[in-house]
């Protein structure tokens, strides 16, 4: 089993003080220990499962910034490990705060079926109610079991009610697109069996792309009453665990109680032995983070560790290849110079090659060429000083196939061959020239290996792992591979043996998905169909196919072994299905590499590859990171971005997407003015450009518009929404015979604006409306870009609209026309936006839209060139404020921080006052109850005294009567 060098771990207080717990990472590096893969995974969970879900405060003192280069493996691991845990903490915190997006994640009641201890972990079997869908749980799900409802654990009172408008607000400006969105729930308790109860719920998602704020119906969260009395000691009693797998109608969960501080672990461990109901809540899934963590440790055993550390004394260690002549000739006619240079750069001796693909430069086309080149190029031998011979060096850089090893063995030991005549049987067989001929034979063998990569001629079969951060990016390349195919060594087109692996793939690529291919192979085997004689591997797999069913796992392995290209996401490349493949992969190609954190990029590198090609653009949007602290310490930086500090990427410079007037600013501002127009760009000039209000580039200045925050969340600009609609109506009015809906895309940085635009354009389903982040990688003929930001407060910032990478993505989506809607007064405080506004102003592309008349009256007049010239001249006269300096920005940030601190202080004070009011109310109720009890006691006492007095009086009267009678 592979052993990994790990940094030391210091123990934390637990139930047993003798236990050394994998919890907190020690700052001072001591002698490293060796960890197997299972120990790495245990280390990951021992850290996370000790967390207190009711107090997930960050630990900044454990973090350190990502550097450009690292001293050694320990320096590398101890930098990224705390940052990975911080991001995990932030994801868990967000999941707890906002809830899951669907009602399948609602808390339910469960009971313990069994408990066992395995390798310091507490393994618990939980059984659910019959009406609970246990298939909502998956391997590596993080769950919480608690004595009381999770909302009580997180700080709410049992009698507290909360409506949706209090608890759910639109996604804030700082929220990254793609992150979980806030949801609200309504929970009711229903009895299902004699011992087990569960809950049902309805979830409303304010951030649903098909709904606006007005669509959300107000509901109330009601916390079911607890069966166990709530006390300060048991209010937050809970454990965090991870689901191992489904288990006979329930789930098998792993907990780690030894590392938990305080008395919580002991109390829960005792209560687990009793037949009581536990609230079980699904929090999030840790599969990707677990794979990143394992890859972080395993990378120390990879061929790329020196490259990852980026030490100056490290030389290149990769293999060198050359393109076959016929294939090179074919590429010369179908690829431009920058694309061809990128292809040849991947064949150089660099272990990792960087290819930068700005928008519209044919990045996917280059990836297809890369696959053709890397599958069919021949290996160029390295000549190093001090070596014994050429074969020794080739053997170091390449693993020989079994056939090649057998040929070498036969050459070196021919007497083991049955047909070899023994020398003692015939002395005439003595060959005194054997040594010389043997040397010649070896030289010929290695020459053939050098020229073809195989002793049998032709190229050895190489295997490529093709990855991207998202399913959409993977499916885009796979669909192009299916449609366009590849080129072989002779420059002829062919369809490669391609397999798409992993869940979430698009229906367009189903024909090459692993599950589909396995089903087809099973049907073929079970139908007793004739086996094609050309497929020896299939014949071997179907020997004895008289059985009605086949081993799915074996068929899956067979399909993967036959594949030339395996395509999957970065995360799924760490699944056991691929990590256990025999032989691994020779080459890894990662698309959109600049959109992945470095730890994600490490996952596919585990497969023993000799070469990695990273394709991406660090000038566009980075990976989505939840933790602001992790971003502060550069955890969101991609491996591509860090490596380019030392190694300049090969940039594609010819763009085929944007009209030259649209391309001009992004090229100058983001790409050092290196982008050139392809031969097709003149065709981007269309007939509707005769109306200059339709582009190619127009900035409509709504300097009087204002933004609002419905519910205090995401930003919304009503005036820009109306402007977008009236511009679309103007298109259809001027050109009534044309379908513009399918050619227009409307984008905005803010989700609430997107929701409002979708509501306005709901009768035009052909129009694509999305966030800037959601539109990355896509394009439309016409793009309307709503900037939204127009804060009322003077000096206020423009939020994440100031991110220059988001700005780049927005400006590079259109082919023919880009219409920008924005408030120049608000945007010009930012340096980058100020330059764009100045650019449009200098080129007579800035059109002021006044508020003297309603938009529905002004915009229909935007049809004549004379009016455009008149308005653009007014636009040139607009005084654009200077952007804020760095000092002013920092000062504003400090003011914002102070403002937030004051708001937090006021909220805290208000919360304390509310708590005091609640306490006073409870005290009054208690006093009233006590007074009532005292009054009752006093009244009872008086009644008793009166009764006693009457009894005494009656007794005296009776005694007097008796005495008289005696007389």
Swiss-Prot record:
Top EC class of this enzyme: hydrolase
Enzyme Commission numbers on file: 3.6.4.-
Superkingdom of source: Eukaryota
GO terms, molecular function: ATP binding; helicase activity; hydrolase activity; RNA binding; transcription termination site sequence-specific DNA binding
One of the Pfam families matching this protein, by short name: AAA_12
Basic residues bias (residue ranges): 900-909
Keywords: ATP-binding, Coiled coil, Helicase, Hydrolase, Nucleotide-binding, Nucleus
Cellular component terms per the entry's GO annotation: nuclear body
Binding site for ATP: 357-364
Region feature Disordered, mapped onto this chain: 161-192, 529-553, 892-967
Coiled coil start-end: 890-949
Any Gene Ontology biological process: termination of RNA polymerase II transcription
Positions with biased composition (Low complexity): 928-937
Xref: SUPFAM superfamilies: P-loop containing nucleoside triphosphate hydrolases
Cellular localization per UniProt: Nucleus
Keyword Ion transport: no
UniProt family annotation: Belongs to the DNA2/NAM7 helicase family.
Protein's recorded name: Probable helicase DDB_G0274399
Phylogenetic lineage: Eukaryota, Amoebozoa, Evosea, Eumycetozoa, Dictyostelia
